[in-house]
């Protein structure tokens, strides 16, 4: 679960990480009032969305009058912000962060993340802040510094000192960096976070280290341990179907194509989408109904797909290991009766109780296209969507 910048900064500040003075605003009037409370002569108005690239997209604005604060708030609030990470539909701006500007002498990058390869929490840092870290890792991996935290000891201060001196910080700044890294580590443990990122970590003209932007990602699998996550969750940043899917325990991600996919198992779902693209189609979604999907769960999954008006055809690809094909067939029949099936549906069933499932579908009177094998199913789905 992603958090907004203003939420991430508040949580970091609770752990002693220095952040600029800033106040969130949820209306134009609030934006003006918060700017007056902070005092001038200048402010930074930041759109709050779960996506990077806000600056290049016009979502971060430097202003030097209250009138300009009001104008920026009017232009941003309630509108979609399209960045390189959002897709063409953009993300809805429901909040702003009104922040005092900082005099920046130098920028660093610092992030804590879970390194699954090493099964360790790892700090990733570079002398170049404000950059696209993925591009830097690909083009100049030697510029990245890694600090691996041993689970038996936790994060130790000497690790921050080593990093600070490598970056050419003075003794006072190294002490600040140590406190910042300790705070990030405490926050990650407290929230079960997969990532705590500060980009950039600024060194101001006065020599202070300051978290100018922050990102926190909580582990969805640990949210049950964090009732406070309900207050942090922002439904405006997710597709409505994704929110519904989450309520029913389905793994759903909306995409840009017109072929709806219902598959059991994440790996099989990705392979299905790959084959659709290989044969000239575009998947409308990733949808994993899980290993032991019951009829009601499949019913809800089918409704999710049918609620997407872009979908022109549906591909159901089930390998019945834990999932019984006859239960899935019951879910399809139930959903078709409730929603009304008006699109071509390609069905590929293999495995447990396949024959019983296919018999149920045949006896239902539904107009279905059966497929032998995954390649055949993908080709038929693409043809159905195109014609």
Curated annotation (Swiss-Prot):
Binding-site residues for ATP, renumbered to this chain: 46, 53-55, 99, 102, 107
Reaction(s) catalysed (UniProt annotation): succinate + ATP + CoA = succinyl-CoA + ADP + phosphate; GTP + succinate + CoA = succinyl-CoA + GDP + phosphate
Alphabetized SUPFAM superfamilies for the sequence: Glutathione synthetase ATP-binding domain-like, Succinyl-CoA synthetase domains
Required co-factors: Mg(2+)
Residue sites binding Mg(2+) per the record: 199, 213
GO molecular function, one term: magnesium ion binding
Cofactor binding mode and count: Binds 1 Mg(2+) ion per subunit.
One GO CC term, this protein: succinate-CoA ligase complex
InterPro entries: ATP-grasp (IPR011761), ATP-grasp_succ-CoA_synth-type (IPR013650), ATP_grasp_subdomain_1 (IPR013815), Succ-CoA_synthase_bsu_CS (IPR017866), SUCC_ACL_C (IPR005811), Succ_CoA_ligase-like_bsu (IPR005809), Succinyl-CoA_synth-like (IPR016102)
Pathway of action: Carbohydrate metabolism; tricarboxylic acid cycle; succinate from succinyl-CoA (ligase route): step 1/1
Binding site for substrate: 264, 321-323
EC number annotated for this UniProt entry: 6.2.1.5
Residue stretches making up the ATP-grasp domain: 9-244
Keywords: ATP-binding, Ligase, Magnesium, Metal-binding, Nucleotide-binding, Tricarboxylic acid cycle
One Gene Ontology term from the biological process aspect of the record: tricarboxylic acid cycle
Binding partners and assembly: Heterotetramer of two alpha and two beta subunits.
PANTHER family: SUCCINATE--COA LIGASE [GDP-FORMING] SUBUNIT BETA, MITOCHONDRIAL (PTHR11815:SF10), SUCCINYL-COA SYNTHETASE BETA CHAIN (PTHR11815)
Family, as annotated: Belongs to the succinate/malate CoA ligase beta subunit family.
Function (record text): Succinyl-CoA synthetase functions in the citric acid cycle (TCA), coupling the hydrolysis of succinyl-CoA to the synthesis of either ATP or GTP and thus represents the only step of substrate-level phosphorylation in the TCA. The beta subunit provides nucleotide specificity of the enzyme and binds the substrate succinate, while the binding sites for coenzyme A and phosphate are found in the alpha subunit.
Protein name, as recorded: Succinate--CoA ligase [ADP-forming] subunit beta
């Amino acid at each position: 679960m992603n958090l907004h910048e203003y939420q991430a900064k508040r949580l970091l500040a609770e752990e002693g990480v220095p952040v600029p003075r800033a106040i969130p605003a949820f209306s134009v009037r609030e934006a003006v009032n918060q700017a007056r409370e902070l005092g001038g002569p200048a402010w930074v108005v930041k759109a709050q969305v779960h996506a990077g690239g806000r600056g290049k997209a016009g979502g971060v604005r430097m202003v030097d009058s209250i009138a300009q604060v009001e104008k920026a708030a009017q232009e941003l609030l309630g509108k979609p912000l399209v960045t390189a990470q959002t897709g063409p539909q953009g993300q809805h701006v429901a909040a702003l962060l009104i922040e005092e500007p900082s005099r920046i002498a130098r920028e660093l990058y610092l992030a804590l993340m879970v390194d699954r390869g090493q099964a360790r929490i790892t700090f990733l840092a570079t002398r170049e802040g404000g950059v696209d870290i993925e591009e830097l890792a690909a083009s100049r991996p030697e510029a990245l510094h890694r600090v691996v935290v041993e689970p038996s000891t936790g994060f130790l201060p000497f690790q921050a000192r080593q990093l600070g001196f490598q970056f050419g910080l003075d003794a006072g700044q190294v002490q600040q960096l140590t406190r910042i890294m300790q705070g990030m580590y405490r926050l990650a443990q407290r929230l079960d976070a997969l990532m705590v990122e500060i980009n950039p970590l600024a060194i101001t003209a006065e020599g202070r280290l300051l978290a100018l932007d922050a990102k926190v990602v909580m582990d969805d699998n640990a949210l049950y341990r964090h009732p406070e996550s309900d207050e942090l969750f922002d439904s405006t940043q997710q597709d409505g179907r994704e929110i519904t899917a989450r309520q029913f325990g389905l793994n759903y991600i909306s995409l840009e194509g017109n072929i709806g996919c219902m598959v059991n198992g994440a790996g099989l779902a990705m392979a299905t989408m790959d084959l659709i693209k290989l044969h000239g189609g575009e998947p409308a979604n990733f949808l994993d109904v899980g290993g032991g999907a019951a009829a009601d769960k499949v019913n809800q999954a089918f409704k999710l797909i049918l609620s997407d008006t872009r979908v022109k055809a549906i591909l159901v690809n089930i390998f019945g290991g834990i999932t019984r094909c006859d239960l899935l067939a019951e879910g399809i029949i139930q959903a078709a009766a409730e929603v009304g099936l008006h699109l071509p549906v390609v069905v590929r069933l293999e495995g447990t109780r396949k024959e019983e499932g296919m018999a149920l579908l045949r006896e239902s009177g539904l107009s279905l296209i059966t497929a032998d094998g995954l390649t055949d199913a993908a080709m038929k789905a693409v043809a159905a969507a195109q014609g």
